[in-house]
Amino acid sequence: VDNLLISQPDAGEQALEIADTLVRSGAVDVLVVDSVAALVPRAELEGDMGDSHVGLHARLMSQALRKLTGTVARSNTLMIFLNQIRLKIGVMFGNPETTTGGNALKFYSSVRMDIRRIGSIKDKDEVTGNQTRVKVVKNKMAPPFRQVEFDIMYGEGISKVGELIDLGVKAGVVEKSGAWFS
């Protein structure tokens, strides 16, 4: 935590300029943008509530990613964009889910992962963690469409005990029978 930099810019353009500057400087190894949905374009912030800004967010992301792609490729920086899932209105067939910010991020990214909470972990009546599923949706570096499930314990992170049990089952050292292990 000693080497953690946090920036809370006013607008999306400012956030992406800061990101570009940090990547160019070579001073950071990992840069996380949390979240793409929060990168609100300046014109939208300065406009009135009822104003229509169709495609402004998508244009911002497209311009920024064109610039950032080359910069990131020449640097030794890992850039992570967190995003949210939204539902498309009126979709009858196909997947109604989409991500914010247009298609640029889908196109320019090297790896895309879909991370979802699939259940809760409880100790009696108290929720102590989440069961999580990660699907690799796109991968330019390795085979795509792989999937993994693991437990995230609050205040702890990924459950070491759960991982050891899963590895034991996979290796044949631990036997699983329903919800019981032996």
Curated annotation (Swiss-Prot):
GO BP term, pick one: DNA repair
What is this protein's function? Answer: Can catalyze the hydrolysis of ATP in the presence of single-stranded DNA, the ATP-dependent uptake of single-stranded DNA by duplex DNA, and the ATP-dependent hybridization of homologous single-stranded DNAs. It interacts with LexA causing its activation and leading to its autocatalytic cleavage.
Identify the domain of life.
Answer: Bacteria
The answer, when asked if Cytoplasm is one of the entry's keywords, is yes
Q: Recite the lineage of the species.
A: Bacteria, Pseudomonadati, Pseudomonadota, Alphaproteobacteria, Acetobacterales
* Keyword DNA repair among record annotations: yes
Q: Entry's InterPro entries?
A: DNA_recomb/repair_RecA, DNA_recomb/repair_RecA_CS, P-loop_NTPase, RecA-like_C, RecA-like_N, RecA_ATP-bd, RecA_C_sf, RecA_monomer-monomer_interface
The family line of this record is: Belongs to the RecA family.
Q: Name one GO molecular function term.
A: ATP binding
- The name under which this protein is listed is Protein RecA
UniProt-annotated location(s) = Cytoplasm
